[in-house]
Amino acid sequence: MSENVELRRAHILANHILRSPRPSSNPSLTPEVCFQYSPPELNESYGFEVKEMRKLLDGHNLEERDWLYGLMMQSNLFNPKQRGGQIFVSPDYNQTMEQQRQISMKRIFYLLEKGVFQGWLTETGPEAELKKFALYEVCGIYDYSLSAKLGVHFLLWGNAVKFFGTKRHHEKWLKDTEDYVVKGCFAMTELGHGTNVRGIETVTTYDPTTEEFVINTPCESAQKYWIGEAANHANHAIVISQLSMNGTNQGIHVFIAQIRDHDGNTCPNVRIADCGHKIGLNGVDNGRIWFDNLRIPRENLLNSVADVLADGKYVSSIKDPDQRFGAFLAPLTSGRVTIASSAIYSAKLGLAVAIRYSLSRRAFSVAANGPEVLLLDYPSHQRRLLPLLAKTYAMSFAVNDLKMIYVKRTPETNKAIHVVSSGFKAVLTWHNMRTLQECREAVGGQGLKTENRVGHLKGEYDVQTTFEGDNNVLMQLVSKALFAEYVSCKKRNKPFKGLGLEHMNSPRPVLPTQLTSSTLRCSQFQKSVFCLRERDLLERFTSEVAELQGRGESREFLFLLNHQLSEDLSKAFTEKAILQTVLDAEAKLPPGSVKDVLGLVRSMYALISLEEDPSLLRYGHLSRDNVGDVRKEVSKLCGELRPHALALVASFGIPDAFLSPIAFNWVEANAWSSL
């Protein structure tokens, strides 16, 4: 280094040390004021009565819901933490898998002590079932691991005993299950078979000399897999197994097997292993079970559908094996109902957090030296959240309608419940996952923190798209049911009745060529276009299958060939069913602000569903100009729903403590003083 360079550096350093700073050229300059949190409630007014909207959305048992929210907020078991000047309750996801499992069980016993589960199995009737649904939904808002464990114990194990069993089983098991003396699990899924229940490989035989059934896992693919509660806590299992009688396979049957003693030791001839860590739901102890010729009493066959007498004679009032299989699966519909319902409450939670955050968080300014703009005032942000909000509203009405049909079910409605619950379960759980992803992105990096809930919920709820039936398979089930109904009515020359197909008895709707704003928002137009879409796809699907069937191919193979048309049809059926529930709810309301806002929500649901489905354009029912009109109207509706955004999420009725810090004063929650 040259001497001149060294001298120059020394001179610069001396100036830094010895000289005073130059006076500012702008002596009046003051530091900019830091960002201040402003609660959305200060700037956003409610344009309708929130309590009335909540009654519509929750549908039933509001007092019981609020009672349970309060119970959870009162106990340290629910991990209360102060953030940003208020208390939040949510699970601690920093706990190990084993800690999460144990705390979930402690929470269950706390709720048991408080009487939350009273009557869940021993009381009957629509009111008792609706109360159970309501309390179950609240548990899921706190933690899906908690509600999943309850679902396994009450809705799978408990309902199996209740609906597959008879008096002898009810007297022995139901009260002890309700009191958690017996802890149950539901062993249906296997390593090699899940949605295809018919293919289950576990085999049960009967020994008439001892009057015992013998359950066996014949190969590794037959091990029971993903069995909730099996890894740690369950002491009894419902075992779904093939029943082999004297070399004849009688198909799927349902048995009770003890897998642990009351001290928690694994029973002889049973092996249990842990499924391990998961992407979510680590408070649920999923396990694997092998049966090595496990012997159980003859009375442990749940015999409402079929029985084996002491001498080994097989008896059933249902002679047809396919009908008998259907009878075994029918009681499982409640699982799809609760999954659909919990998916919507999860979407509500994500939207409440994301929309509240977008009403206080600002970014960029649209004018020189202007104030930064609220996120939800950007049309792009409205477009990403408000259509999902409208869909969540529509699906809330749909799932409430499904629950009412389910609790008032009759043998005549069982088929419709099975079909509708399959479609709703698939569409609503897909909607939930899409909503949570959009909400995670909409809150930026804050969505990565588990305390803010939105991002973590994705891992918790992802399982819903595949358990209790893979969504794609369920959608195929819907289209097959519609196909069978269509063919049956045409063959018998009878009018359509049931599954919402009555509109096909009327002339084919004719859509206007010009779609004005008032036309697009007209409920009759919306219903007509949804009916036309379903009708056209059903006719196309049946025509395609019938044409190819005439060439000698099997119907099942042809369903597979036409899977895309099949999925379009089942989506059209389900979305039309959802729209109808909103129309029904709207029709019951008196004129007023609640009805007006619900009309906007309904129009948004209808039009965004049309915008996202290319089948109407593909088959020529809407022109390219029509599709452009729909797109523009969705954007207009975003602007009209924007002033109601806070009130719409407030109507979810979720207490502040169950949301997250970024839904409130996120500046204070992240301040140094809050550490």
UniProtKB/Swiss-Prot annotation:
One of its GO terms (cellular component) is peroxisome. GO terms for biological process: fatty acid beta-oxidation. It is found in: Peroxisome. Keywords: FAD, Fatty acid metabolism, Flavoprotein, Lipid metabolism, Oxidoreductase, Peroxisome, Transit peptide. Pfam families: ACOX (PF01756), ACOX_C_alpha1 (PF22924), Acyl-CoA_dh_M (PF02770). Residues 1-34 form a transit peptide. Its main location: other. FAD binds at residues 442-457. GO terms for molecular function: acyl-CoA oxidase activity; FAD binding. It catalyses: a 2,3-saturated acyl-CoA + O2 = a (2E)-enoyl-CoA + H2O2. Catalyzes the desaturation of acyl-CoAs to 2-trans-enoyl-CoAs. This is Putative acyl-coenzyme A oxidase 3.2, peroxisomal.
